[in-house]
């Protein structure tokens, strides 16, 4: 019985336990680092590794504390699960870079985890946005269809715009999902090329594999970010309660800065700014470039951890009536069934999505009947009435700015269903706004 009560009150002791474990890790890690500095002649490499370790010890507790708070207040799984996955990016990046800085010979293999998780983060951010929207607006496709046509941004402004509705929604999701496939695939190719000694990381030359993989990864990443930006532009008003701009910048800056600074460092090697004259304890100039990249990432992740603490805060999810066990919250963090389901859905619809053929368009694109016309066809009214009868999801309520945002249906949907009900009862209401277009 006492054991059961202890586990039920896990929210009270889990945070002090985490603090104690972190302090113990510092007690063990700091003497080992000092001993490492004393046993060898201190050089630039060792100093850089020690400084990066200091930033690592500052970064890890900030990120893990926010993750732990989300687990303690795990009240909205569909929103907090992708947030927790995004928050893990900072500890993974920081620890990976610190290990790679210490052991340059295995950097290519350790960095594989970082590069794969980068794509995973972008996918989960898209999942966070779509989960919020579909829970608050069960008829999300109808909302997008009712909006004005969104044109492409430069440099794709000459391309035909994506049809508003299901086509745009699935193409944006597919554009993000493709990066989660391309990035791990190119990472595996990089490992194979490294084993075959044809990778030559950091050397811009069309005779090696690294240059081609950088181009492929860059194009795939840019398109994924473009789809995210287009998705936000279309649904900017609906996403405003969760303040997505700060979250988008946190994800975008970490991913883009880490990628492009690697390209800039490689260019510095190419033009001779980083040369063989100053390799310090590193064996090659390419190893110097990789070490510099890892050192900078360790510093940047400290800043990213602070930014994540505020932009992905746990406070909107704190509720008085909290249920669930410690193990349920912890295991839910590693559950990837939602990713499997999403990939299956995209595979089933990929043909129709690419070709631009939605299953059904509730708002027909006609010159006499468009989104500015106040009369809907009978078939559109029927579709809207059916859609409005679907109960909203009970999860996904985001408590921000002192109130709880509850699931809603579109105003058009609600009005259409009300009009249908009034007609059936034989009651006609006078129009309260503009006269009906003939």
Curated annotation (Swiss-Prot):
It is found in: Membrane. One of its GO terms (cellular component) is membrane. It is a multi-pass membrane protein. The keyword Transcription does not apply. It holds the Pfam family Solute_trans_a. It comes from the Eukaryota. GO terms for molecular function: transmembrane transporter activity. The keyword Transmembrane applies. Keywords: Membrane, Transmembrane, Transmembrane helix. Residues 358-438 are annotated as: Disordered. Residues 374-390, 404-413 have a biased composition (Low complexity). Residues 426-438 have a biased composition (Basic and acidic residues). The chain crosses the membrane at residues 17-37, 48-68, 86-106, 176-196, 212-232, 254-274, 287-307. Its main location: membrane. Belongs to the TMEM184 family. Possible tumor suppressor which may play a role in cell growth. This is Transmembrane protein 184C. It comes from Bos taurus.
């Amino acid at each position: 019985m006492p054991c059961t009560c202890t586990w039920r009150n896990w929210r009270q002791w889990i945070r002090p336990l985490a603090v104690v474990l972190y302090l113990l890790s510092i007690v063990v890690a700091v003497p080992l680092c000092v001993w490492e500095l004393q046993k060898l002649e201190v050089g630039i490499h060792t100093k850089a590794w020690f400084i990066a370790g200091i930033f690592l010890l500052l970064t890890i507790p900030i990120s893990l504390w926010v993750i732990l708070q989300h687990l303690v207040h795990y009240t909205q799984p569909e929103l907090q699960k992708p947030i927790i996955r995004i928050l893990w990016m900072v500890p993974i990046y920081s620890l990976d870079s610190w290990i790679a800085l210490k052991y340059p010979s295995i950097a290519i293999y350790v960095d594989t985890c970082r590069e794969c998780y980068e794509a995973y983060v972008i996918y989960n951010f898209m999942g966070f946005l779509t989960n919020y929207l579909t829970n608050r607006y069960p008829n999300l496709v109808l909302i997008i269809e009712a909006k004005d046509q969104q044109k492409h941004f430069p440099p794709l402004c000459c391309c035909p715009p994506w049809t508003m509705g299901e086509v745009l929604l699935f193409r944006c999701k597919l554009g993000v999902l493709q990066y989660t496939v391309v990035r791990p695939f190119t990472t595996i190719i990089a490992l194979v090329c490294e084993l075959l000694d044809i990778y030559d990381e950091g050397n811009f030359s069309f005779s090696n594999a690294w240059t081609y993989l950088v181009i492929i990864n860059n194009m795939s990443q840019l398109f994924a970010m473009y789809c995210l930006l287009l998705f936000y532009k279309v649904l900017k008003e609906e996403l405003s309660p969760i303040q997505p701009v700060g979250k988008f910048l946190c994800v975008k800056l970490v991913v883009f800065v880490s990628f492009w600074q690697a390209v800039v460092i490689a260019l510095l090697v190419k033009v001779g700014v980083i040369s063989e004259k100053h390799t310090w304890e590193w064996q090659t100039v390419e190893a110097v470039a990789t070490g510099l990249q890892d050192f900078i990432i360790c510093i940047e992740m400290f800043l990213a951890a602070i930014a994540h603490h505020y932009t992905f805060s746990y406070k909107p999810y704190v509720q008085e009536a909290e249920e669930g066990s410690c193990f349920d919250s912890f295991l839910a963090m590693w559950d990837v069934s939602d990713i499997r389901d999403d990939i299956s859905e995209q595979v089933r619809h990929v043909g129709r999505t690419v070709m631009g053929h939605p299953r059904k368009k509730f708002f027909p694109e006609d010159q006499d009947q468009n989104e500015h016309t106040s009369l809907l066809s009978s078939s559109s009214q029927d579709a809207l009435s059916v859609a409005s009868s679907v109960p909203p999801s009970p999860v996904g309520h985001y408590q921000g700015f002192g109130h709880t945002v509850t699931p809603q249906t579109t105003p058009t949907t609600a009005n259409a269903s009300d009009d249908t009900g009034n007609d059936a009862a034989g009651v006609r209401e006078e129009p309260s706004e503009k006269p009906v277009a003939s």
